[in-house]
Amino acid sequence: LCDENTKILHRNTEDSKMDVSVIGTVYPFELLSPNEKKVVNTVEKINLTLRTYTSGYLRFEQDSYMGGNSPWPIATLWMALYYIKSGNRKKALECFEFVTKSATKLGFLSEQVDNKTMKPNWVIGLGWSHAMYIITLAEILKK
């Protein structure tokens, strides 16, 4: 769903808040090319609205789950996969390193990361975050 005026992808026609899940149009679904203008515009907007000062990414604008404003490893890995597909290895590694540094001593990933401490926050040991981490690592190693 692309806004014809801004050329930015949105999660639906009723809501113009940015949502990192629209990157799914590039990966894994490959409906759009990572370098299409509407995708590039969307990524620029995601970086303005969802990227935190610690380099992690929020899920969507005004996300209030558990207080909001905490980056999600899964969202950050999704951005890493976008950057891999777009050929920006440096940014992909930056996202991947953020997630790696936020893991517990045993390597478990959390649902969110505390921006102040960079420690795992909330639920720890999520299958989807670990699966996305492995997928991202495999993609990094391919390049």
PLM features per residue range, with description:
Residues 1-72, 94-143:
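Extended glycan-interaction surfaces of carbohydrate-active proteins
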Residues 67-87:
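Internal helical hairpin/lid segments
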